[in-house]
Swiss-Prot record:
Residues 1-104, 246-314, 505-602 are annotated as: Disordered. It comes from Drosophila melanogaster. This is Fez family zinc finger protein erm. GO terms for biological process: axon target recognition; axonogenesis involved in innervation; cell dedifferentiation; negative regulation of DNA-templated transcription; negative regulation of gene expression; negative regulation of neuroblast proliferation; photoreceptor cell axon guidance; positive regulation of gene expression. Belongs to the krueppel C2H2-type zinc-finger protein family.
Amino acid sequence: MVYFSPRGMQPCSPAGEIAMMPPSKSPVMESAASEQNPAQQSQQQDEQSAKRACPLKFSIAKIMEPDHRPSQVPPPQPAPVSFATNDDDEDEDPEIDADSERSCSPIEVISLDQSPSTVNYDSAFKKYVPGPCSGATSSVASPPSTAAVQQFVSSRHQELLSQYPLLYYAPNQLMCAAAAAQYAALTAQQQSLASAAHLSSFTASLNASLHHSQSLRRNLGHPLAAAAAVAAVAQSQAVPNLQHTLEKSPVAQRTAQSSGLQANLKRKRSPQDQGEVTPPPASTATSATGARSRSPSPQGSIEDSSPGSASGGKPKTFSCLECGKVFNAHYNLTRHMPVHTGARPFVCKVCGKGFRQASTLCRHKIIHTSEKPHKCQTCGKAFNRSSTLNTHSRIHAGYKPFVCEYCGKGFHQKGNYKNHKLTHSGEKAYKCNICNKAFHQVYNLTFHMHTHNDKKPYTCRVCAKGFCRNFDLKKHMRKLHEIGGDLDDLDMPPTYDRRREYTRREPLASGYGQASGQLTPDSSSGSMSPPINVTTPPLSSGETSNPAWPRSAVSQYPPGGFHHQLGVAPPHDYPSGSAFLQLQPQQPHPQSQQHHQQQQRLSETFIAKVF
């Protein structure tokens, strides 16, 4: 018996037994020995058996060394152990001593067979496998012991190969590389065959259940037939589906595609089944599986439509720490944060208004141009953006989707609805620094500040009364003068719209219109032009303050003074705070002049703080 020591691949014999390893012979030496007559061979074998009575010691390093012997072995060439010729008998003892000196662990094997082994062990363990007994030595050695050694070594060889497949790697190209590739190919083939067998059995059971359900629906006319078919399919799906590796294996994909094609061909060939619609096996299995559905795509790949996959939608994982709002991307959360920080890094270069996003600034820039391509079909009013036109169309339709929960008042726009809700909260966060009056909205405070600096940009054409807001002017004309809410109904010069656009933006820039010759931005024409006061009538000298006034209208008025176009009182009848120009310059009162300077300083301070 041959035992393997726990130190690795070094075999050893049990205690009390003396064994000897047969010498490894080259093919040339074996062919030379076979040409001799049987008598010489038997004589040489008897001599060799007598010489091998001593124990043989060698190491695994000696075995793993490459064979440097030439094809024709001369007598003086040293060999590890050779008993082929009689000329080597004299040099056997020094070679044995040299082998014993190089030995790291003793190996003692007893065997009398010299013929090569019929079994080819192409690995690092082939040196330990003794060959079968020849007919000449069968009478000397006992066949049962040799067969036992052969069987043990063979089984041990296969066991080591199964436990240590990486031992196919050998230094100096001693082991065959093709054996490792063959082993890997066989392993992959066995795995694929096992998966294919599992898949085929599952497909067969599924087809059987589907055939049973189809036969029930075809043969039975009772309404319970469909319920029985669904129950059968659900029972077949109660068994766990294929493993994830089987679903991704190419064998499983090809089998599923072939089964689907066969089912389609069967449905096309059978004319009696054309009237009923039967789902294919792939679709039935997909519909029965609710948690994770997989269906083959037309390109042959498997599309995962599970809720957590990319096709099913990304989970929202980014939440705002301030308000708790959840976003599906970090970019959206970054865009949302300026709502809480109040940062408005994108500033308009024309009016100085700030915005949180660059896209909002781009939309805002349109109002500074004269382009209004979007026109209302009902009233003919034009707008810069289509969204503004859509919001305006709600006025004609009477659609007010935003309704207050407290008072039931409806609004066309969401912004107006939010501003109205602040009136019910009771909180007035915007307070005037001059009179300590508080407001719910910031734009109400902005309009209130005009009362302190005597700025009323919106003036009535009938009575010349000034207003801070265009809304107040429309309300005044509608109630007092019984004129429509839209100022366009009046016969006004075309520069009125320009003046209205200018005065609407005047509070935003403190430096606009300070001097009569200063250029100010004009939103309607896109150019720089001096501010135009529409309420100023023509001068008595024949020069007009507004080029829009025709000279014919100038000539028909007397040169003695101003004459209002609508037949109202002349400008000297109006108070000093009127928007009309006076012919005779009045001497300002010292107290009024001091009050005016104080109001001007307050307005500059307010504008510096707000804007």
